[in-house]
Design a protein with these regions (language model features):
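Sec/Tat signal peptide C-region and signal peptidase I cleavage site
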Residues: 32-35
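Acidic, metal/ion-coordinating pockets
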Residues: 6, 37-422
Length: 422
């Protein structure tokens, strides 16, 4: 029975028809409330609107949680690279010039498959490949960020075939993870970001950096590890909120045991090679404190932290048997970049995580971009010397060493006398 309060404050029965309507509305309201409660069960992961014209993501079998105390069944080989942009469909002036040079000078096509094939040898032997997807993926009208006549506007939207090209670039047994927690995933707007996520997932690429929940990755060994991406923005897990970083990583460790963290933060460009324990500013924006971020992630139980965002190589540092590489630089960036030393140098980092979740060994594979979208192994191994020297400068006690083969080692601590100020 539906009742209403009469102006005389006495309860009166409503006419039957109106009562039925009001009751139905009450039921709808209750159902809506129940739906709202269901949606609130995952407070840290707001529901995403389905993207227009984007394929539905593939359904995967649920991964099995790994208790914290359990060991990995087999060593895990992780290879990670920095920023990757596989082509563009924005039809800007720089793109037309770059396409012409690629075809005339290098005999290459700017199509995503052609670009992505250059990544394959750099990730050989990886059980898990991790890259930063620097830009949106989609089609349709171009975003308004750049004018068609632009030669230096940094907006990236890659063709829809990019997602499948990225997956095909790696061995079928390699689990591929793409990070979208970065400052260019919104280059086609919020809807474009949703389309990017959907296309990657449909292609079989795991996506991280979408929200505060780690991305579980099931491995052929039967193990499941998790990857969690951060950027300095409220629409992604915010790397500047260190208490939240600790909370999200700790939650992932409790559930999955082995957690790999990727961070897109720090100032950008040739003057941003140094890593200091301080908040970094770029274009008047706070880009976070990479050192404090890594500390928070390791204190929460992360095994490996991979950095990108500065577009240059930075130092690496040991935290006991765990490892952070603060920036791997540009890997394969098809865009209006000025590619000269040091922005043309990058590296793929490969680390072996043993059964007790320690980094047993690690190495760098040096790369060089000789033209936008044209990548080759760096025979001069410039990346090795850069990372080694930057690590000595920024972390003289805990920084990595890099030998002539790219293998990462530990520094011999200076004696107390050597550390005494003179």
């Amino acid at each position: 029975m539906c009742l209403s309060l009469h102006p005389s404050t006495r309860w009166r029965r409503r006419p039957p028809c109106r009562a039925i309507v009001i009751c139905l509305l009450c039921l709808v309201g209750l159902a809506g409330g129940a739906g709202a409660q269901t949606r609130r069960r995952r407070l840290d992961k707001p529901a995403r609107k389905p993207a227009r014209s984007a394929p539905a993501p593939l359904q995967r079998a649920p991964e099995v949680p790994q208790p914290v105390g359990s060991a990995l069944a087999a060593p895990l080989r992780v290879c990670a690279g920095g920023d990757v942009t596989l082509g563009t469909n924005l039809d800007l002036a720089w793109e037309r010039a770059a396409d012409d040079s690629m075809r005339r000078v290098y005999g290459l096509s700017p199509a995503p498959d052609s670009l992505a094939r250059q990544l394959s040898p750099l990730f050989a032997g990886a059980d898990l490949a991790l890259i930063n997807v620097e830009g949106a993926i989609g089609d349709g009208p171009a975003p308004r960020k750049c004018k068609r006549s632009s030669h230096s506007c940094f907006a990236f939207r890659q063709p829809t075939s990019t997602a499948e090209a990225l997956r095909r670039a790696f061995d079928s047994t390699t689990q591929v993870v793409g990070n979208v927690a970065n400052n260019h995933s919104h280059d086609a707007g919020g809807e474009g970001r949703e389309t990017t996520i959907a296309l990657l997932e449909q292609a079989g690429v795991h996506v991280t950096g979408v929200d505060t929940l780690a991305t579980p990755v099931a491995l052929p060994s039967g193990d499941t590890v998790a990857v969690l991406g951060f950027y300095t923005d409220a629409s992604t897990p915010d790397a500047r909120d260190l208490a939240a970083v600790h909370r999200y990583v700790s939650r992932a460790v409790d559930r999955w045991g082995t957690v790999i963290v990727t961070m897109h933060l720090g100032a950008e460009g040739p003057t941003a090679q140094r890593t200091r324990n301080a908040n970094e500013i770029f274009l008047k924006e706070s880009r976070g404190n990479p050192v404090a971020f890594a500390d928070a992630a390791f204190n929460a139980g992360a095994t490996l932290v991979i950095g990108h965002g500065p577009h240059v190589l930075r130092a690496g540092e040991w935290h006991g048997d765990r490892l952070v590489l603060y920036s791997l630089g540009n890997l394969l960036t098809y865009g209006p970049f000025k590619l000269h030393d040091p922005t043309d140098r990058g590296a793929v980092a490969c680390a072996t995580i043993d059964s007790v979740r320690h980094v047993a060994s690690a190495e760098l594979r040096a790369t060089k971009q000789i033209w936008t979208g044209v990548l080759q192994p760096d025979s001069t191994a410039r990346a090795f010397r850069l990372v080694d020297s930057l690590s000595a400068l920024d972390f003289p006690e805990t920084g990595v060493t890099v030998d002539s083969t790219g293998a990462l080692g530990r520094r011999i601590p200076r004696s107390a006398a050597d550390r005494t100020p003179r």
